From Swiss-Prot:
Binding partners and assembly: Binds to the N-terminal domain of the chaperone ClpA.
Taxonomic source organism: Neisseria meningitidis serogroup A / serotype 4A (strain DSM 15465 / Z2491)
Name the record gives this protein: ATP-dependent Clp protease adapter protein ClpS
Cited function: Involved in the modulation of the specificity of the ClpAP-mediated ATP-dependent protein degradation.
Name of the encoding gene: clpS
Lineage: Bacteria, Pseudomonadati, Pseudomonadota, Betaproteobacteria, Neisseriales
Classification via Pfam families: ClpS
HAMAP family linked: ClpS (MF_00302)
Protein family membership: Belongs to the ClpS family.
GO biological process: protein catabolic process; proteolysis
Amino acid sequence: MNHPNTDHQSDTLLSDINTQPPKRYGVFLLNDDYTTMEFVVEILTEVFMLAQEQAVAVMLLVHHEGKGLCGTYTRDIAQTKQHQVMERAKTEGHPLKCIVEEV
């Protein structure tokens, strides 16, 4: 018995499948008047693994523009990062908001 997925002649079957790369989602921090700059930098370095200089640059963008991109990920990872930020902010008493948007 010939199985289509094991037959050497079926290579074209696999190449005909049109796969799209997964959509990308940006994780953004939103500015508020209470969360400290130090806490934002800590989140950026520990949750998003940004270098100190990058974290400071994103923190300043959040502070001056009201919103800053922390990174782009697949949907599941972006939502996990958002959850980590929100839980940590809540635990430490900060009103920091984090959103996920398709980019």
